[in-house]
Amino acid sequence: MSARDFVEGEAVLDDEENENEEEQEEDYDGEVHEGAGTMNHYNDSSEEEEEDDDDEEAARAIREGFIVDEDEEIEERAERRREKRKRRREEREREDEHLDEEDLELIGELNPAFQSAAATESKFKRLKRGHKDHRQASQGIDDIFNSDEDEEAAGDYGRPSHRRPMHDEMKDFIEEDVFTDDELEREREDLEIARPAKRGVTGLGATDAAGLDENALEDMRAAFGDGNEYLFALEMEEQEEEQEEDQEKHLDLKDVFEPSQLAERMLTEEDNQIRLLDEPERHQLARKPYRNLVLTEEQFREEAAWIANLMLLKKRIEPELREPFQRSVAKVLEFLVTDDWEVPFIFQHRKDYMIHATKVPVAGAPADGDTSQYTIKAEKLLNMTDLWDIFDHDLKFRALVEKRNTIQKTYDNLQSLFNVNDSVVQDMLSTAVTMEELQDVQDYVHFQYASQLRDINLMNGEANGDTHRRKATGRSFFERVRNGKAYGLVRAFGITADAFAQNALKEGRRQYTEDPAERPEEMADSFIDNDFSNASHVLKAAKALFAEEIVMSPKMRKVIRQAYYMNGAVDCFRTEKGLRRIDEQHPYYEFKYLRNQQLSDIARQPELYLRMLKAEEEGLVEVKVRFENFDHFRQRLYPDIESDNYSEIADAWNRTRREVLDMALGKLERLINRSVKENIRQECENHVAKECREAFSQRLDQAPYKPKGMVLGTVPRVLAMSTGTGIVGRDPIHWAYVEEDGRVLENGKFVDLSIGDRDRSIPDGKDVEALIELLERRRPDVIGVSGMSPETRKLYKLLTELVEKKDLRGATYTDERDEEISDPLEVVIVNDEVARLYQHSERAKKDHPSFGPLTHYCVALAKYLQSPLKEYASLGRDIVSIQFKRGQQLVAQELLLKQLETALVDMVNLVGVDINEAVTDPATANLLPYVCGLGPRKAAHLLKIVNMNGGVVNNRVELLGVNAQYPAMGVKVWNNCASFLFIDFENADPDADPLDNTRVHPEDYDIARKMAADALELDEEDIKAETDENGPGAIVRKLFRDEAQDRVNDLILEEYAEQLEKNLNQRKRATLETIRAELQQPYEELRKQFALLSTDDVFTMLTGETSDTLAEGMVVPISIKRITDDHIDGKLDCGVDVLVPESELTDRYDIPVRALYSLHQTLPAKVLFLNKKNFLCNVSLREEQVSRPTPRPRDHMRGEWDDRQEAKDREMLQEKTQSGGRVMRVIKHPLFRPFNSTQAEEFLGSQSRGDVVIRPSSKGPDHLAVTWKVADGIFQHIDVLELDKENEFSVGRTLKVGGRYTYSDLDDLIFNHVKAMAKKVDEMMLHEKYQEGSKDATYSWLNTYTKANPRRSAYAFCIDPKHPGYFQLCFKAGENAQLHSWPVKVIPQGYELQRNPYPDMRALCNGFKLLFTNMQAGKR
């Protein structure tokens, strides 16, 4: 196995602070794992090695570009193959022509020249070494990894004994390890000497050695030729061999790309199957785990009822609508499963099945009545979200059925082989409706029939997994009891676990308990055997088994679970770490002392519960779910297991039964507690994900910005402008003008747009005229403004004032009186959440390579105004980076992505996609994956086929291959997507059908044409004449041509609907309404108007602050910008302007303000008033105010907050502060801050990597702490010992770190210690072997790499977040080897691995390889 491949790996390291050791830098030596992983061995065939080299070269060429200069690459590879074959053929010929010793002796006797040649061999070697010296000198560290040529030479020409040993699997791992001794030189030269010359030269050399002179040579050439006459035949033979070899060794994509790369590009075999199978792509992906599961009719009916009951728990539906609701759910399920229709199709074209319509007689109408004397009362039963829920529930039910089938199969085996007949399994298996209940049954079967199941596995020859072996080992005690005499005492308890559970469930008739004739202790004597040698052991064993039977009873678990959900409560307890870390300004303080939260309360605040669990993960709190009044519940269960008899014996047995029940309930409480806690988490995650979906739907549900005088849906021309994070008037204002078709026609920069004052002879800014000229020339419909700081508000005001004073107007339009008018140009602040992601993206660089990031940002702002839907759809998986709801980051990303995707699917299918526009416009093509029936694979395939068919779709049926060369999809997918792909109607095109430009599905075209004919009052003869002449679309075309669309309003749709239901059994009432609307206005814009941002939204967008992070009453840090005698001006970190009025400057009026404060000083202030519109806040610097921040309002009922614990903790913290109280140390250094470790981390959180804070140390006056940012979220705390101090408050003249490093002052320490380590961290993280992500992610990468390259090894570095200042070196020596990791410590001089220092990454990598090789050698 080639360990050379470790050069192909990557890696990372992270660190995390230990609270008790925050100011110490301790050595961390990770354990070196030396598991004996299986190594792949090399095949000792030079031919195979050469062919592998070819494969690797081909793979590398394709990886580096998909295909780059393919023809040249192929020619080069072919040339290399020819050269190698030529060498191999020459070698075989030499081997055939080898002379044995007798032949050589004979020749030597006849020709003394051979003896002399042999005698000078050693001299020849020395000469060869001499002419190689200059090349040897040039080979340095750069050639460590470039040993391919040397290896190839060795492989081609070296004798087998000179090659690497068969079992030296790590040889290639070392690529060149410091072997520069004479022996290596000699071996390399020997190999070169062994290399033969070219054919022609070889012949001449032989004759020359034989002593022939020039004349003799000429005669020989004349007689025999120069040896190259038949070279053409040899070359033809080589070409044929090459062609055969290419056919045999055809490279598939899987031979070139890693599986992860193929999956990312959707090029796997599975992707191809999804692409071509005639089934909606989303259905295929979702049902992939259950592809082979086929539901019976009975199971299908069961599923419909199961889903309806689940949904009824959360929907408020009138009792009389419950049955219609269940029927509606069943019908939707049929559409989803049997017909394979996606949710948007069902919602759009099967609406009638989601509406319950009843006829209500008109008041006062005669009873005998005319049937027309009634009105229709329609109740909507299901909405779009409900349909997606049904789709999800269908998947859950399939998982349920699959697990049930597995258990049933196990039980069937028990029945057939051991005649098992267990009513518990039979009853519970058929009635189980949740995964938990099925798991209960499975646990029961494996407990009750453990030995039989083991026998079945042995009979079947199945190897039990680790889990099964653990179960068998854990239950061997209970099996001994069950199979021994002691089980008789279990029976003597007088009631089975199942009968007791039946009593507790209040199911059926009560089961009565029988008492034996002896007391438990006395009866136990009769069951003594070899396993249990005395009565107490027997009784103890019997009680344990009976308790375990109760624990394993599915019915008993159901009792406890139901009671738990009814009586569950959540408590939150702070930990020792959380005591100090969570102060009153901390976001977790909201639940630091939260108690007695009912599960119903949690359901109303799902985000709160998820944050509690997050805080628990961080070790700050402990979240406990408990059973309220559990003792009362226990007392209620006692009568269900006790006997009703009155005697001493009965009392003794009842006491024993209660003891058993107590044992069982303790286990059950712990077991159910874990599942309840996890279930609540899942429900809360689902709830938050759905809230995000709802918020995303609202952002998607907005049409393009509507220009004045235009209809909704018209795309505007936009001029977008931004200063980014710059300051208006100082930094350039970037702008981009985007046409309505999305083309960026112009872009540039303005600097000075200030408005002059004629009265004061102040001219306009130098760029005002250029802006006016641009606006008059391009006539945009709107100016969009955004940015990343409050300065954007100033730009907005400046442009608004400019438009007003210069009377700048938008494009003209015709009003109701047919007069051309124009309105003042509107300036709007645009939501920039998509633009922020776009500006630095690869997509932006590809779209506009010459633009800068801020121009990209402006382009995205303009396109957002033109179509928010397209911009959101273009993000793909990056959509999860946008914040929709609080707590969103606590939801599993895949779950969130799935919910957001459904919102996109809903909106894309509401709007529809112009298929021909999608072919030419990438932004529109981004919508195709969300079209009903399609997905990313089918959408790409659709575009490919359309382009193959000429690049234009003339009508919808062409997608099926009708009148087209290739079909783009199958019938089922076409049925799903046809009505959502529209074709712009052109009256001149004879193939165009006007209905292809509507939301009407092709299955309803005949109905639409009939309605159009009736609206035009055409009889059958007129219809026939029109269609014969102009085709089937002629009637609708005539309706549009005559502008008679309004006539369809005169049609009575009820009669149409009744006829369709009566004659064709089709419910189409809602569909008819859709057809009527589409005939009047095809693909009408149904989205809401473009939503302008509210004041709060603008404030949050430009500052990043929300009501939770910045509000009145909070204490925040401010930076002083200007000091006067009566006020102070400052700024918050977020850019909001700060004003400190005179009354709030200080409590010390005897000291001048300028003496108290200095410019650029940062100090805490309490927010008194916040003006979000003008980005201004008033604050107080008075100590009285700052020391008493307004507590956050807590909306808790009595008993839900532990005030006593809160007061106790506050008092304890004050005591600790006072007992350890000393004068706060202040050091005159720009990096000093009076912070603790938490505050230092929070301060450095937004800083750059390598930034530093010097702070007081908790270890005393002779210590300082230095905190520096290693990486995002990772901070190292360094303890600095001060020596040679003048006094307690001065900094020591000598500073020591870790006992190893000494510095003269703080600047010396910062530069030569912290900054030096930061450089080494940068060097590591920029190295090609570094992997972003966790250790698990790096392991995953190594597994993927070695799986794709099984003969290669790999290593990589990753950051170690648990040990700041450390990285992990992860490696895997081949596909079947074990994963290992070694810690790498960052030190000022470089890195430390296994206590060996290395100055840089190259030395570290080589050092690792040597260490690894030595370790392997030691093993052998």
From Swiss-Prot:
Keywords of this entry: Chromosome, Nucleus, SH2 domain, Transcription
Biased composition (Acidic residues): 11-29, 45-57, 67-76, 145-154
Region listing for Disordered, in residue ranges: 1-104, 117-167, 1186-1208
GO cellular component, one term: pericentric heterochromatin
Biological process according to GO: cellular response to stress; G1/S transition of mitotic cell cycle; negative regulation of transcription by RNA polymerase II; nucleosome assembly; nucleosome organization; poly(A)+ mRNA export from nucleus; positive regulation of transcription elongation by RNA polymerase II; regulation of mRNA 3'-end processing
Compositionally biased intervals (Basic residues): 125-134
Domain SH2: 1230-1330
Gene3D superfamilies named among the record's database cross-references: RuvA domain 2-like (1.10.10.650), SH2 domain (3.30.505.10), Spt6, Death-like domain (1.10.10.2740), Spt6, helix-hairpin-helix domain (1.10.150.850), Tex N-terminal region-like (1.10.3500.10), YqgF/RNase H-like domain (3.30.420.140)
Any one GO molecular function term: transcription antitermination factor activity, DNA binding
Pfam families, alphabetized: HHH_7 (PF14635), HHH_9 (PF17674), HTH_44 (PF14641), SH2_2 (PF14633), SPT6_acidic (PF14632), Spt6_S1 (PF21710), Tex_central_region (PF22706), YqgF (PF14639)
Location(s), subcellular: Nucleus; Chromosome
Keyword Nucleus: yes
Domain of life: Eukaryota
Keyword Transcription: yes
Function according to Swiss-Prot or TrEMBL: Histone H3-H4 chaperone that plays a role in maintenance of chromatin structure during RNA polymerase II transcription elongation thereby repressing transcription initiation from cryptic promoters. Mediates the reassembly of nucleosomes onto the promoters of at least a selected set of genes during repression; the nucleosome reassembly is essential for transcriptional repression. Essential for viability.
Family label: Belongs to the SPT6 family.
Protein name in the entry: Transcription elongation factor spt6
